[in-house]
From Swiss-Prot:
Organism: Blastochloris viridis
Protein's UniProt name: Uncharacterized protein in pufB 5'region
SUPFAM superfamilies: Helical backbone' metal receptor
Sample GO molecular function, one term: oxidoreductase activity
PANTHER family in alphabetical order: LIGHT-INDEPENDENT PROTOCHLOROPHYLLIDE REDUCTASE SUBUNIT B
GO terms under biological process: chlorophyll biosynthetic process; photosynthesis
Signal peptide: none
Recorded superkingdom: Bacteria
Pfam families from the UniProt entry: Oxidored_nitro (PF00148), PCP_red (PF08369)
Length: 255
């Protein structure tokens, strides 16, 4: 038997343990449902439940955590898994593949080590980072953390809900950012036409982002691309304008 991660896995673990020991696990399971697991239903019924089916996550951790968290979040909770990398004893991890996955898939939540946190910072990602492996600046003294058992399952869902709230916060414009907007031109700009390949590049850039933040992201990128086109005297928005706008936005987030 291995220490379980997730609700169904924990229940199956306890029943298997009961068969091996000759003890009845059902009273304990029922008691846990009324106590330890009870907050989970409140978390599930919160406003963030609407985002579970469209929210994505990635994980890079040891094999037990990667397999367990992926099964729990993807199979039991309905989140979308963008990538999952397992670290095994005696096998050197492919950090390059992890970095590339983070840069290309751009999940909303990333479970991992300090390495993954650095990879997110490199591309200015707004993904929410949740520590799930070493090395990392991480303190785990409470019994519900790490993520094993019923207490761990409740803890993980709580962290995911908080991450979704943080993602919503990142969408909101800050007052200091609103103060930095360009002055209104004396002559109003007419709507700028887009080349088909430029619009396709815009769609591809937004498609790679989590559903929750696409609405705000597409507006920022579209406005930035049109500003780039006007700045260089283009009459239409080109692929190059979209690429420069995306690079500028990523660079600004990273700063």
């Amino acid at each position: 038997l291995q220490a379980p991660i997730g609700l169904h896995s924990t229940t199956a673990f306890l029943r298997a343990l009961g068969e091996l020991t000759g003890l009845d696990p059902e009273p304990f399971i029922e008691r846990e449902k009324r106590t330890t697991i009870r907050p989970l239903w409140d978390l599930w019924r919160s406003m963030t439940q609407d985002f579970f089916g469209t929210s994505s996550f990635g994980i890079a951790a040891n094999e037990t955590y990667t397999r367990g968290l992926r099964h729990f979040l993807e199979e039991e909770m309905g989140l979308l898994c963008s990538f999952a990398f397992s670290r095994k004893p005696g096998v050197k991890p492919d950090n390059g593949a992890v970095r590339q996955a983070i840069q290309t898939s751009m999940p909303l939540i990333v479970f991992g080590r300090y390495n993954e946190r650095m990879y997110l910072a490199e591309v200015g990602s707004r993904a929410i980072f949740i520590p799930a492996s070493f090395p990392g600046a991480i303190v785990r003294r409470y019994t519900g953390t790490p993520v094993m058992g019923y207490a761990g399952a409740t803890y993980v869902v709580q962290e995911v809900c908080n991450a979704l709230y943080d993602a919503l916060f990142n969408i909101l414009p800050l007052g200091t950012e609103l103060d930095k907007v360009e002055a209104t031109p004396a002559r109003r700009h007419k709507e700028m036409p887009w080349n088909d390949d430029a619009r396709a590049a815009l769609d591809d850039s937004v498609e790679a982002l989590p559903v929750l933040i696409r609405t705000s992201a597409v507006k920022r990128l579209r406005d930035a691309a049109e500003r780039e086109a006007r700045a260089v005297g283009e009459e239409r928005v080109t692929v190059a304008c979209v690429a420069r706008a995306r690079a500028a936005l990523v660079g600004g987030q990273a700063a």
